[in-house]
Amino acid sequence: MKYLHTMVRVTDLDATINFFQTLGLNELRRFDSEGGRFTLVFLAAPGDEDAQVELTYNWDPEELDGGRNFGHLAYAVDDIYTLCQKLMDAGITINRPPHDGRMAFVRSPDGVSVELLQKGDALPAADPWQDMANTGEW
């Protein structure tokens, strides 16, 4: 058995791709189904192409309800402070800042929770992160 991907339905494909690319993921492939009226986009972190996120975009408008049965996606990152600053500079809210130099949470445009974990040991606590308040749900 081999893990293939996690599928996430999205309502704004371009905004969601931009979000994940800002996180550092690359688009691997895309499939448009005229008959099924949907688009699939597969993304992965560089060097970790086996752990893919599949974005499913249905062309006909639909309302998506966020189920609590789906928790979050998680990625190990080289420098949590640098990535969180990059995300903030791109207008992405850091819902749970890396107070401890170890963990942060953000949400995609459709509200999918993404956990960011510092590779190895936590970084030393630093400003502005250690005093930054949590925002919304994560």
Predicted feature locations:
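Core segments of cupin and vicinal oxygen chelate
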Residues: 1, 7-50
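Short, charged/polar surface micro-motifs in flexible loops or helix N-caps
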Residues: 46-50, 60-62, 80
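Vicinal oxygen chelate
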Residues: 30-32, 39-41, 75, 81-138
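Short, mixed charged/polar active-site loops
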Residues: 50-52, 113
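Eukaryotic phosphotyrosine signaling hubs
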Residues: 3-5, 68-72
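Short, low-complexity disordered segments enriched in Ser/Pro/Gly and basic
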Residues: 63-67
